[in-house]
Amino acid sequence: MARTNPLEKVRNIGIAAHIDAGKTTTTERILFYSGIIHKIGEVHEGTAVTDWMDQERERGITITAAAISTSWKDYQINIIDTPGHVDFTIEVERSMRVLDGVIAVFCSVGGVQPQSETVWRQADRYKVPRIAFINKMDRTGANFYRVHEQMRDRLRANAIAIQLPIGSENDFKGIVDLVRKRAYIYNNDQGTDIQETDIPADLQNQVEEYYTKLVEAVAETDDALMTKYFDGEALTEEEIRSALRQGTIAGTIVPVLCGSAFKNKGVQLMLDAVVDYLPAPTEVPPIQGTLANGDTVERRADDNEPLAALAFKIMADPYGRLTFVRVYSGVLKKGSYVLNATKNKKERISRLVLMKADDRQDVEELRAGDLGAALGLKDTLTGDTITDEGSPVILESLFIPEPVISVAVEPKTKNDMDKLSKALQSLSEEDPTFRVNVDPETNQTVIAGMGELHLEILVDRMLREFKVEANVGAPQVAYRETIRKSVTNVEGKFIRQSGGKGQYGHVVINLEPGEPGTGFEFVSKIVGGVVPKEYIGPAEQGMKESCESGILAGYPLIDVKATLVHGSYHDVDSSEMAFKIAGSMALKEAVLKASPVLLEPMMKVEVEVPEDYIGNVIGDLISRRGQIESQSTEQGLAKVASKVPLATMFGYATDIRSKTQGRGIFTMEFSHYEEVPRSVAETIIAKSKGNA
C-alpha cells in the first residue's frame, strides 16, 4: 500500500502547557478548522473531543494524552493533547518522547506558571523543537508582551515574536504577521470573517521594533544572512521564513504567536506556523537504539529501513488492549508478527487504528513517522521497542518518575477481590507511575502514585470502568532510606549445622553512598575464586532484597554501592540460599554501621494569592517545615515559591481555600528527596516499629 502523505508533509506535534492555559480548547479549534469535527466542543461544557474520559469531562482537565490525526493544507498532522496537572506528568513525558514538535500554550493573563517550567524542561530533555502560542488575548488582564518577557526570563528561551496582537482584552480584534508584514482583522467570533489589511498606523513603531528583533534573530542562524544584514540589505520574506524554520528545528529559536482559541482568533495562523516551522520526521535526528551486542545504531525515518517502533502508552478499551506506538522506521503491518525487542518476545498485530480521541479508523499499516494504536500486543508495555524479528534493536526508553504517595486499598466486599486485582493490573499497565504491591507484613494492597488527585482518579476509574468499590486508607508518604558514610570489611556469615547436609555462606563487603538516583549498585572484586562465581549472583540478590524492605524503618534503601571483596565457601555445605542469606546479613550489618538516615519527598510548591493573604500563607508554609525560595507581587497578586515536605501537605487544597476565602491557588510537584530532621525521623521510625 502506497504512502498517502510524503514524510516531508507529516507533522507529529504535541500541545502542552500549564493547567487552564487553554490547551484542550486550542486542540478543539485545530480539529474544527482542519475539518475533523463539525461542531466545536467546549471544555467547560464537557463536550471536548480530546477529553473523552468521564473524569476529564466532569473535572474540565485533561488526564490522558489523547492522540488524533488530522490534516491542514495537504499536511498530515498527528496531535497529542497532554494534561497540564502535575500529577499526570508521565503523560506529558511519554508524549514528548515520541513527538517531533510542540505547541506550548501560555495564558496571556497567568503567564509562565510552574507547570509551564516543568513541561519546558521535559521538552528540553528530549530536544523537542517548539513554537509558543500566547492564548486568551481577549481576557481581562491579557498582556502579550509581559508573557513574552517571562518566557525569555523564566524559561531562558530565545522567544522571538513573529506575531503581535492588535488590541487586547475586549478590544482584541486581530493579529499582525511580522514575517509577512500584514494585519489580519477578525470581524466575528467564529473566525470565519477575516480581513487581511495593512498594519494599523498606531502599531507601526511597535511592529518596526519587533520586526528588527526578528530579523536580528534569524540573521544569527546563517552566515550569509548575517553578512546581508550587516551590509544593510533587507531580508526577503522567504529568507526569514526559511531561517526561522532552521532555528526552530535546531532549538535556537522559539517563534511566539498569539490569539484567542475560545474566540476563534489566530488558530489558522498557528496551523500555518506548525507547517512552516515545526519539523517533519525526516528533519529530526534519527532515533538511536542499542543492538544485542551493545553497539549503538541509528534508525532513519524511512519506510525502507527495518521496523523500529516505540510503545508509549497502553490503554484498556472495550474492544481490546490498545498499545499506542510511534513508528520511527519501516512499516508496521496488520496481521504481521513482530518482536518485542525489550522482552525478546514474539507478538502478533491483529489490528491497527488511527485515533480521533475515542473514535478510531482501521488501517492496514502504520509507516515511518506515524502515530497510531495496535491491538493484539499482549506482553508489550510502555517504553518497549517493537521491531522486525530479523533486525532487533532496543530504543531508548522513557524517563519514569518514582511515585511519592501511597494508600492502602481493599474491596468493599470479599467477592470483589479478583475484580480489584484485575483492575489494578490493568491500570498499572496503562500508567507506569502507578505502582501496586502487597505489604508482606499486613497483607494489605498498597497503591502508589504521583499525588492525591492521581490516586483519586484511579480509584474513581476502578469504580466506573471495572465496577469495583474500594475502601481507601489515609495517604502515606513514600519515605526512603540511605547512608551517609562508607564502611569496609563488613561480614555476613550464615552457618547452620543440624545433622546431615549443613548450610554455609560467607561474604565480606564494603558499602558506600552512591550517586543520587542510582538506587542499588553492586560490584564484585572477588579474585582467586574465594567465592565461586555461581554464588556471587545469589549474594547480590540477598542484598538487593534487603534494600527493598529497608533497615531503619522498612522503607526502600536507595543510592548505595556494595562491593563484594572477600568471603569463603564449603565444598559440601555451601548453596545459593546460604549465600543469599549471607549477602542479606552483610548488607544489614553494613547499613547500621554507615550512619543510616531517612529521606522524605520534598515538593516544589508555588502559591498565588491576593496580596492581603500573603503573610498567612507564608506563615502556614513555614509551619509545615517549608523553605521559602522566592516571593513576588504583580497586579495585586502575590506568588510564593517554596520547597515543602510532602508529609505536611496532605489536605492543603482545603486549607488554602479556607485561609484565602477560596481565592488562593497552588501547584505542587515532586522536587527531590531530602534527609528528614532527626526529631521527625525518630517518630517515623518508632511508628514503623509499632512503638508509637
Swiss-Prot record:
Annotated localization: Cytoplasm
tr-type G domain location: 8-282
Keywords attached to this entry: Cytoplasm, Elongation factor, GTP-binding, Nucleotide-binding, Protein biosynthesis
SMART domains reported for this sequence: EFG_C, EFG_IV
A Pfam family assignment: EFG_C
Residues that bind GTP: 17-24, 81-85, 135-138
GO BP annotations listed: ribosome disassembly
Keyword Disulfide bond set for record: no
PROSITE patterns: G_TR_1, G_TR_2
GO molecular function per UniProt: GTP binding; GTPase activity; translation elongation factor activity
InterPro entries xrefs: EFG_II, EFG_III, EFG_III/V, EFG_IV, EFG_V, EFG_V-like, EFTu-like_2, G_TR_CS
GO cellular component terms listed in the entry, alphabetical order: cytoplasm
SUPFAM superfamilies: EF-G C-terminal domain-like (SSF54980), P-loop containing nucleoside triphosphate hydrolases (SSF52540), Ribosomal protein S5 domain 2-like (SSF54211), Translation proteins (SSF50447)
Function comment: Catalyzes the GTP-dependent ribosomal translocation step during translation elongation. During this step, the ribosome changes from the pre-translocational (PRE) to the post-translocational (POST) state as the newly formed A-site-bound peptidyl-tRNA and P-site-bound deacylated tRNA move to the P and E sites, respectively. Catalyzes the coordinated movement of the two tRNA molecules, the mRNA and conformational changes in the ribosome.
Similarity field: Belongs to the TRAFAC class translation factor GTPase superfamily. Classic translation factor GTPase family. EF-G/EF-2 subfamily.
HAMAP family cross-referenced by the UniProt entry: EF_G_EF_2_B
PANTHER family to which the protein is assigned, alphabetical: RIBOSOME-RELEASING FACTOR 2, MITOCHONDRIAL, TRANSLATION ELONGATION FACTOR G-RELATED
Alphabetized NCBIfam families for the sequence: EF-G (TIGR00484), PRK12740.1-3 (NF009379), PRK12740.1-5 (NF009381), small_GTP (TIGR00231)
UniProt protein name: Elongation factor G
